[in-house]
Amino acid sequence: MGLFDFSVKELHDKLVKKEISPFDLVSESFNRIESVEDKVGSFITLNKEAAFGVAEELGDAGIDPNNMLSGLPIGIKDNIVTKNLRTTAASKILENFDPIYDATVVSKLKNAQTINIGKLNMDEFAMGSSTETSYFHKTHNPWDLSRVPGGSSGGSASAVAAGEVLFSLGSDTGGSIRQPAAFCGVVGMKPTYGRVSRFGLIAFASSLDQIGPITKNVEDNAYLLEAISGLDANDSTSINQPVERFSDSLTGDIKGLRIGVPKEYLGEGVDPGVKQAVLDALKTLEKLGATWDEVSLPHSEYGVASYYILASSEASSNLSRFDGVRYGYRSPNATTLEELYTKTRSEGFGDEVKRRIMLGTYALSSGYYDAYYKKAQQARTLIKQDFVNVFENYDVIIGPSSPTTAFKIDGMINDPITMYSNDILTVPINLAGVPAISVPCGFSDGLPVGLQIIGNYFEESLLYKVAHAFEQETTFHKEKPNL
């Protein structure tokens, strides 16, 4: 039994009693990385020397018994800036970018005394659903190395599933935490928009992006979200909402819980094996005293189209800062300022990023703004209202995290429309800004299936309660890939 088979709470107790040291945990991480990283490719940059340095300091100072995360190893998605540790967003244009400040979540993790093992692979600028658009390498799913881990936080999910780190941070713009968590058989939470500061997150679509935790179990996830949540003066979209002790909500009691199951989430396009796993999960929740009804989110069908117009439009604006002048890659072949801009961006961005920048610029252009961008915003309002309507009568909404299990590497990379349609069950949640968690709920042909539990605004505690009650009745979260 490896050290990472223990939960956060169990490891904390061992650290406080000095049965193990932070140095032991960091060693466990790097030994595992040495053993499996060549197969999975979770990381872009390792932080080995600094990690062992912090571990020794914490070992000498002693673990704070009131600090649940002290001395525990974490991996951080490579679009979250880390002072003096290369941060690339998996793009050539930021290949050698060395940030001069920490993201707010990184500062909070340092205050919590976690130990950063390294920066995790992702789709370039978080644009993708498979971690295949990374400039550096493709990440492989630990359950089947011929398949994708999901995306864009594929490295964050694969590192946890492969036991390279205890937990990780990802970001979720249209499903980028929940879908890889589902594909890799781990737990991933997308918090309410504004719950976690985005300061220091390299922006893709600012009205949709949200940072969240990926862990092996629900309790660990709750501890990590507690540590990174809260108002931040550096992020005007962060919301002044009290940071609850999410871990206190894990009572196992969900008697009387009212679940809405959208007919749109179990219809055509959802794999039979995925659908069956979700229906079985609903039976488990019924046994625990919950009830469920079929409901409708009628505007879900417009989710993917609206999302790709809005997200791409915001990306075309956000990514205009990468111009070869201030930081990042600069084309050596330019002789004029105009050439510097065009060549730097043509050479520095990958195909998918360029595709979305062009799509967004087109949607925002004169003559098309009303037809595309404005229409997408109107559809977003309707999608948001769908959720508001259902939550008037139901406590949570439940469905699959993804319509399929993990697909083959290179299986969809040249078919962007099919790839985009994979996000059909996750993008409405980002458009509405509500929280959702993916928890393992079974297997289909040996591949993990994720159950998506969606809550009303700032009801993460309820999501954790439901997810934890389900987890306690099942063993799916204890299953591990054979690497």
From Swiss-Prot:
One of its GO terms (cellular component) is glutamyl-tRNA(Gln) amidotransferase complex. It catalyses: L-glutamyl-tRNA(Gln) + L-glutamine + ATP + H2O = L-glutaminyl-tRNA(Gln) + L-glutamate + ADP + phosphate + H(+). GO terms for biological process: translation. The active site is at residues 77, 152, 176. Disulfide bonds: none annotated. The keyword Protein biosynthesis applies. Keywords: ATP-binding, Ligase, Nucleotide-binding, Protein biosynthesis. Its EC number is 6.3.5.7. The keyword Magnesium does not apply. PROSITE patterns: AMIDASES (PS00571). Belongs to the amidase family. GatA subfamily. Allows the formation of correctly charged Gln-tRNA(Gln) through the transamidation of misacylated Glu-tRNA(Gln) in organisms which lack glutaminyl-tRNA synthetase. The reaction takes place in the presence of glutamine and ATP through an activated gamma-phospho-Glu-tRNA(Gln). Heterotrimer of A, B and C subunits. This is Glutamyl-tRNA(Gln) amidotransferase subunit A. The gene is gatA.
